[in-house]
Amino acid sequence: MPIDPKLNVVPFISVDHMMKLVLKVGIDTFLTELAAEIEKDFRRWPIFDKKPRVGSHSQDGVIELMPTSDGSLYGFKYVNGHPKNTHQGRQTVTAFGVLSDVGNGYPLLLSEMTILTALRTAATSALAAKYLARPNSKTMAIIGNGAQSEFQARAFRAILGIQKLRLFDIDTSATRKCARNLTGPGFDIVECGSVAEAVEGADVITTVTADKQFATILSDNHVGPGVHINAVGGDCPGKTEISMEVLLRSDIFVEYPPQTWIEGDIQQLPRTHPVTELWQVMTGEKTGRVGDRQITMFDSVGFAIEDFSALRYVRAKITDFEMFTELDLLADPDEPRDLYGMLLRCEKKLEPTAVG
């Protein structure tokens, strides 16, 4: 089914459509293809209009807008982060996004992005690990077994070949949930009783916790030589997971430094501390992993270009699978300068028909 060319119509991907699209494509294929699109955009990083996301912070959480443009397309995401939401039966993170034509300003796509954000976050993490983890990595510890954990596991298996998972969460029901959800894909799963137990023998350590506080999830004694740390949980000022000692021992890689200095684990460090931008590793301008004993860390906070890539990717997919609704979103008067006349014509249609 082609997308309707009518000017009032914007294709809309609902939650139901997104889930069905992911399943029709296949979760592993979706993650692998999405990672490839993210890498394409990272490799043309300099052409993008970039800025730290605009956030409204409160004691309960944060609401943010994440915009970017490559000069032809413009995309933004609305996203929140409210760690206490789960106690009220709500998601910690919800999101939606828009992709628009820069030439005329018209939206080309409106999409749910709660599920899509989980997928793009996991795809980006695994993509970073492809460059930063040891090539023979097979075991990953996941500290924090909430909504993002299964997506991380699937992405690391699809892209890096991770086979064994060591899971820990202070909420044991979350660990049981994660292990149960991942039994089908064929992982070797160990449910652990502590961070120290979870990191034993891990090639990759993923931290993906939700509490909005300065926390030390990963301490110096948890990290041995050669480990790659995938630090995902940091996403706002005042929220950290990694100890200062671990930060100082690691070679740190980030998406967009002006944003990561505000929201990532590196907010604990002086701004003079060296960090490397991930796109520069992909293009060969900077080095990533240089030895088997090197400790690498991806301080991931999420950046708008990843959402831009995700919106581009799903827009290309929806016509193949007919996974969208035509949304009457834009006013389209017969004469572009006669918007008021459009209102009057609607009023006329609503008038009761005279009976002669």
UniProtKB/Swiss-Prot annotation:
Induction or repression: Is induced by octopine. Is part of the occ operon.
Amino-acid biosynthesis is among the record's keywords: yes
Short name of one Pfam family: OCD_Mu_crystall
Presence of the UniProt keyword Nucleotide-binding in the record: no
Gene name tied to this protein: ocd
GO terms (BP aspect): L-proline biosynthetic process
Stated name of the protein: Ornithine cyclodeaminase
Annotated residues for binding of NAD(+): T92, R120, A147, Q148, D169, T209, V232, G233, G234, D235, K239, S300
Family the UniProt entry places it in: Belongs to the ornithine cyclodeaminase/mu-crystallin family.
Activity control, per UniProt: Is inhibited by L-proline and L-lysine. Is not activated by small concentrations of L-arginine, and is even inhibited by about 50% at 0.5 mM L-arginine.
Molecular functions (GO terms): ornithine cyclodeaminase activity
